[in-house]
Amino acid sequence: MKIAVVGAGKWGMALAHAYSQKNEVVISSRGKRDLPNFVSLQEALSCEYIVMAVPTQFVREFMSEHFKFNGQKILVAAKGVEVSSGKFLNSVYEDFLPRENVAFLSGPSFAAEVIKSLPTALVVSSHNKELAKSFAQAMPNFIKAYTDSDVVGAEVSGAYKNIIAIAAGVCDGLELGNNARAALISRGLVEMTRFGREFGAKRDTFISLGGAGDLFLTASSNLSRNYRVGYGLAKGKSLKTILQELGEVAEGVPTTSAVLQIAIKKDIYLPIAKEVGLLLEGKDPKSSLNDLLS
């Protein structure tokens, strides 16, 4: 099958590499025109199957400007919550096409390892079982792809784990040890589950690949951009400097703001997210972690 990958960041390119093992893949990006198999946005968005690797906060603007629905089927590869509306990413896409035409990709995965064809397990979630199966079966042999129908659980897990990863990065940057990081991640899983259950997510999703699996990976490795945000803050760098050094979006930063807005409206107890929000606003990292772990 022919698949268009829209968005040529590290994750978009990794997925293009993965899907190209068994399929015809074309790539489109507003900023990179010298890529192999590059096509215009118009051509990419007219393909039946599209992998969307556009950063969360730019999706609405991008879709409004470039997308016209004509039966396309989309696999959402980004993770996060839209700050302006408080909507999860699949809900944003559902403003532009039917939910039966949208699937969501989750699971413990770093672009740097997928691009090397290292063994990986992912989950494709959709309200449309056949759509999830189509995107999953098109994956290469080095990726074990599962399917699921709990889109909300996948979305919450994919977004929330980035918040916990920031906190874990601070923990390691302060050299508080493995015990402290394990406690923080475990409590983060409970907090993530509590948040997701408010939206009808299934509890089992949070102990699956897309939940605990992705959380443990993202919150324990410097390959994670969000982990590096927290680590940098612990080492005394400003958030602005850290984001400039990363050169790519760290979705946990805007997601923290969006989640806290939702928590206020729904009165949800989210102590780790609250502390991460204060950290991003300039609170001393040592004081913040002390408040969380004492």
Question: Residue spans of the language-model regions?
Answer:
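NAD(P)+-binding Rossmann beta1-loop-alpha1 motif at the extreme N-terminus of oxidoreductases
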Residues: M1-L41, L45-Y49
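Rossmann-like NAD(P)(H) cofactor-binding subdomain of soluble oxidoreductases
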Residues: G12-A16, V39-L118, A132-A136
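A general structural signal for well-ordered alpha-helical segments in protein cores
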Residues: G12, V59, G86-N90, A132, ...
